[in-house]
Amino acid sequence: LGRDYHKVVRARLQKLAERIAAAVGPFGHRVFCDSAPVMEVELARRAGLGWRGKHTLLIHPKRGSTFFLGTLYTDLPLTADEAEPDHCGSCTRCIEACPTGAIVSPWRLDARRCISYLTIELKGAIPEPLRAPIGNRIYGCDDCQLACPWNRFARPAALPDFAARNGLDAASLVELFGWSAEEFDARLAGSPIRRIGHERWLRNIAVALGNVTGKDGVAGETSAIAAVRAALA
C-alpha cells in the first residue's frame, strides 16, 4: 500500500553498487527487482539467504518470507555462501491455506489459480469458479505466507516508503469502486497497484463486492449493482 517496491529496492541496490565501486573501483554490475527474467528466489536460496518453502517463496530463518527480493549482478570474484537446508519438514499449512488450491503440491504452484496472478497479471474476466475463493481481496493474496509458522518472526517494514498511503488500509470496497480513472491515477501515483490500470482495479473490486454483497453497503443500490455487473463482464 506504500511506494512501488520495484523502484525503492532498485534504487537502494544502485546505491549499494555505488558504495562498492567507491571501495573497490569500477566494476560491472546490474540491478534487478522483478524487472527481468531473473530467478531471484532460487538465486537467493543458493546464496544462503534461506530455503524455498512449499509455497515456492524464500523463507529466512529469522525473518520469515514477508520481504522483497532484489538482485545485484556483478563480475566481482566473490566467495559463495553455503545454501540453507530446508526446515519445512512435514508442515503443509501453506498448501492447506491457499483459497484456490493453487499450491497443487509442495514446491509446485499453478499460477493460473493464484489470486495474486488473477488480480494483478490476468487480463480480461476472472474465471467464475475462482471468483468466490477470492473473497474480499482486490490486489494480491498472502494467505500462504500468513499461515506459515516461520512468519511469526516477520516484522513490519521499517522504511516509511512502505507505509500505507491515502487511507488505503481503511477504505471500504464501495468507496474504492467509486474512484474515477483520474482519481485512481492520482491516488495511486507511485504505487505498484497503479500498474494494473483502472479497468482491472474495478474488475477486482467488483468480484470482491459480489462476494460480500449485503456486508458492504451494496445490496439494494441499483446503480452500484449495475456498475459491478458491467465491471465483471
Model-derived features: positions:
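Amphipathic alpha-helical scaffolding segments comprising HEAT/armadillo-like alpha-solenoid repeats
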Residues: 185-187, 216-232
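Flavin-dependent oxidoreductase catalytic cores
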Residues: 83-93, 103-106, 194
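Inter-helical turn/loop segments and adjacent helix faces that build the functional surface
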Residues: 78-85, 105, 125-128, 151-158, ...
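Short microdomains enriched in Cys/His and/or Lys/Arg
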Residues: 113-129, 163-181
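C-terminal amphipathic alpha-helical segment
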Residues: 128-161, 179, 183-186, 190-194, ...
